[in-house]
Amino acid sequence: MVKETHRFETFTEEPIRLIGEEGEWLGDFPLDLEGEKLRRLYRDMLAARMLDERYTILIRTGKTSFIAPAAGHEAAQVAIAHAIRPGFDWVFPYYRDHGLALALGIPLKELLGQMLATKADPNKGRQMPEHPGSKALNFFTVASPIASHVPPAAGAAISMKLLRTGQVAVCTFGDGATSEGDWYAGINFAAVQGAPAVFIAENNFYAISVDYRHQTHSPTIADKAHAFGIPGYLVDGMDVLASYYVVKEAVERARRGEGPSLVELRVYRYGPHSSADDDSRYRPKEEVAFWRKKDPIPRFRRFLEARGLWNEEWEEDVREEIRAELERGLKEAEEAGPVPPEWMFEDVFAEKPWHLLRQEALLKEEL
């Protein structure tokens, strides 16, 4: 647990970094996280990567119809999950946040059930894959239209302020969202109202095929916070500790009633934008190889190893545990069975009107 709030500089030219490329500690304050916490961060990152790999298998075997790979985002997403109060604070995620969902505690049965559209999906198979939600964990159901969840996040945060709940709304998005009108409207509204919100850009430098330099003339996304009169933090999002400490500072700042912040976590997606994308058409292999050398998982592994918190035997034990959890979650999701067609009539009206009852009866006759 963080014993005190560490003040980080806003609007820096270079990303805030606490772990060097070789795993060395770069912070100007003593590390105050215990070994078990550090190991948990690593395990969650590993689980996020392995879940991502399992999603790829699902699409290639025809068990799902869409994926949005997130390899390279693990440090950022796991850090966010650990920096908030799961089930108390609210999360307004975007479609690449399955690592965040898993680290927050959404069961694998539900995540995989959502990918397969089985009865294990709390959304009853109504969303396209990669669009989970969790009422129990205050995890807002993912919306496809880019940045459309930013105004609802602002509105939720304002309600938290008015009701004095002590909660914080955390809203994540990709770099492409920052070119949408909803993004500006939502953050401006939250800033004007002093809402307890943290807006986090997982900047992987590509909005599908549009690279960052064609997305905006702003040097950084964090710089855009100037327009709203709120703090803007530029962070190395492939550094799990820098991401954790900065996001936690922004969250606690919001919780104290000091208003919203904008955090830019610079990451890189190793895979395509989605299963509908061929990333070799717009980015060179050399670029991907360059970023592969900055992989957040080996980087944090070196950090742990230097502190006697990692060895190959422990790594294999953890991987085996995660494999077993993935197999069990997939088995439970598949055994739940497909969503029945008649479910389409549920949750449409509080009380089914006559015409809906009629349609339901006609469907049952056909079935």
From Swiss-Prot:
Q: Which GO terms describe its molecular function?
A: 3-methyl-2-oxobutanoate dehydrogenase (2-methylpropanoyl-transferring) activity; metal ion binding
Q: What is this protein called?
A: 2-oxoisovalerate dehydrogenase subunit alpha
CDD domains in the record = TPP_E1_PDC_ADC_BCADC
For biological process, the GO terms are:
branched-chain amino acid catabolic process
Q: Which residues are involved in binding substrate?
A: 66, 95, 128-131, 144
What family does the database annotate?
Belongs to the BCKDHA family.
EC nos: 1.2.4.4
Q: Which SUPFAM superfamilies does the entry link to?
A: Thiamin diphosphate-binding fold (THDP-binding)
Catalysed reactions, semicolon-separated: N(6)-[(R)-lipoyl]-L-lysyl-[protein] + 3-methyl-2-oxobutanoate + H(+) = N(6)-[(R)-S(8)-2-methylpropanoyldihydrolipoyl]-L-lysyl-[protein] + CO2
Per the entry, what this protein does is: The branched-chain alpha-keto dehydrogenase complex catalyzes the overall conversion of alpha-keto acids to acyl-CoA and CO(2). It contains multiple copies of three enzymatic components: branched-chain alpha-keto acid decarboxylase (E1), lipoamide acyltransferase (E2) and lipoamide dehydrogenase (E3).
Q: Could you confirm whether the keyword Metal-binding appears in this record? A: yes
Q: Which UniProt keywords apply?
A: Magnesium, Metal-binding, Oxidoreductase, Thiamine pyrophosphate
List required co-factors: thiamine diphosphate
Q: Which PANTHER family match?
A: 2-OXOISOVALERATE DEHYDROGENASE SUBUNIT ALPHA, MITOCHONDRIAL (PTHR43380:SF1)
The record, for Pfam families, names: E1_dh (PF00676)
The record's annotation in InterPro entries points to: Alpha-ketoacid_DH_E1_comp (IPR050771), DH_E1 (IPR001017), THDP-binding (IPR029061)
Q: Where does Mg(2+) bind?
A: 175, 204, 206
Per UniProt, the enzyme's principal EC class comes to oxidoreductase
On assembly, the entry states: Heterotetramer of two alpha and two beta chains. Directly associated with ODBB in the E1 complex.
